[in-house]
Amino acid sequence: MTARVRKDSANWRIFGGGAMLAGSVAWLIALLIQAAGQGGEISTWLTIIGFLLLAASGFFLAFGQTGSNGVVGGSVLGKLGFVAFGVGFLLMAIVPLLAALGVALPGELVTVGAILLVVGGIVGAIVTYQKGVARGSARWFFAIPAVVALIWVATTLGWIAIGGNILVTILVIAYAVAGLLFLLNRR
């Protein structure tokens, strides 16, 4: 007899939502430190840790802790979306991580990572809504950071111009709220 997933045993919400919330908070602290003009190694390492936690959240949201079904249920497309989201943040973390250790990688890997996290985030948001594994606002809210990430990548690539760090700050806060909603989900 197999055990059913209950509201207190859905590990995708605990590990995926928790990692997304923790990664967003680390990234937000790094942005605040940079805005205060105190950047340096602390903000670099906080950003790397935040990106690694956000990468882990993508994998946990896709597969749960045990490799079964995550927030997208059994949807292969949804799993691929959240894996692409995770790989995107992993690439964005590896470049500054290796640079801090003295190894230079092409900067285009960050662009590839950003595109992967946007495409994966949009696919993951659509499938999350369709499958209905997440309930309430957690079911639809992930679409907000996915769209904000799309705008962020468009500004990063120079397609549109939005000055300052306001867009990335909004993106980080949106990821934090999405992580919190996943974490507190009642499914």
Give the residues covered by each predicted segment.
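Hydrophobic, aromatic-enriched alpha-helical segments typical of multi-pass transmembrane helices
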Residues: 2-187
